[in-house]
From Swiss-Prot:
UniProt source species: Clostridium perfringens (strain 13 / Type A)
Protein name: Nucleotide-binding protein CPE0354
Annotated GO MF terms: ATP binding; GTP binding
SUPFAM superfamilies: P-loop containing nucleoside triphosphate hydrolases
Family: Belongs to the RapZ-like family.
């Protein structure tokens, strides 16, 4: 079990850091009273491995309860919990700018100057910062870079291309475009096996249809360009912190052409070491509905 205590200065990026940890599979709890950490830790142990990565956001918002944090940390240490403290900070200038941009007051100076609250918070958090395992100064960190840093420190060591979950999805336009699609490709320009009597009963997963679709010159040109486009887009999506990508391939009924093309794209991405899954949404939909217009 791995505990990460996320703390630091208000406005330094704890929310974004927590989102990044959540994307990495951490069970995240925001603003838990520090005194409850021991009980929470024991509850996680009793989950029997169902909760094995935890991120607790603890900051000055806890008010008088914040002073209980050190006692709780000692409890974790005494009971051999694998815990780490992540401390986020930024320069006064950057913090003031962020507060002004969001039109928020500082929690330690709700009716006064922002800089006064920042100075007070720095003083109160000095000891906690000294105990931190990792300190990140976000003054010059774009969100993308912070995500990369969090992944480097607290990820599971997967290659960067494995941090984006890709789904290749075939569908039929007659049943609607999948609403969660990121990229949609229309392959109805490819000759349709439906109109060839000996191919009509099969699907794009069967060799006769697959061989027919992939042998078309239109298919070869399309797959070549699609492969190049995916190879260009995916690393850029990863850099921007995107965690899920749905690539939808559509034909008329979602049984022949889109299935064969989706299978080919899936294999191509798999060979390039991307984390990819395959789904054929409408492959049997026409049969189930008794509609043979594919």
């Amino acid at each position: 079990m791995r505990f990460v205590i996320v703390t630091g200065l208000s406005g330094a990026g704890k929310t974004e850091a927590t989102r990044s940890l959540e994307d990495l599979g951490y069970f995240c709890v925001d603003n838990l009273p520090p005194k409850l950490i021991p009980k929470f830790a024991e509850a996680c142990v009793q989950s029997e491995g169902k909760i094995d990565k935890i991120a607790l956001v603890i900051d000055i918002r806890g008010g008088i309860f914040f002073d209980d944090l050190f006692e709780s940390i000692e409890y974790l240490k005494a009971n051999d919990f694998n815990y780490e403290i992540l401390f986020l900070e930024a320069s006064d200038e950057v913090l003031v700018k962020r507060f002004k941009e969001t039109r928020r007051s500082h929690p330690l100076s709700p009716d006064g100057r922002i800089i006064t609250g920042i100075s007070e918070e720095r003083m109160r958090l000095r000891e906690l910062k000294d105990r931190a395992d990792n300190i990140i100064d976000t003054s010059n960190y774009p969100i993308r870079n912070l995500r990369e840093k969090i992944n480097l420190l607290y990820g599971d060591g997967k290659p960067v291309e494995q941090n984006l979950s890709i789904t290749v999805l075939s569908f039929g336009f007659k049943y609607g475009i999948p609403s969660d699609s990121d990229l949609v490709f229309d392959v109805r320009f490819i000759p349709n096996p439906f109109y060839i009597p000996e191919l009509k009963p099969f699907s794009g997963e069967d060799e006769p249809v697959k061989n027919y679709v992939l042998a078309q010159e239109e298919t070869k040109g399309f797959l070549s360009r699609l492969s190049d486009m995916a190879e260009f887009l995916i690393p850029n999506y990863i850099k921007e912190g995107k965690r899920q990508l749905i690539i939808s391939i559509g034909c008329t009924g979602g049984r022949h052409r889109s299935v064969a093309i989706a299978n080919a794209l899936y294999k191509d991405l798999l060979c390039k070491n991307f984390h990819v899954t395959l789904e054929h949404r409408d492959i049997n939909e026409d049969i189930n509905r008794g509609d043979r217009k594919l």
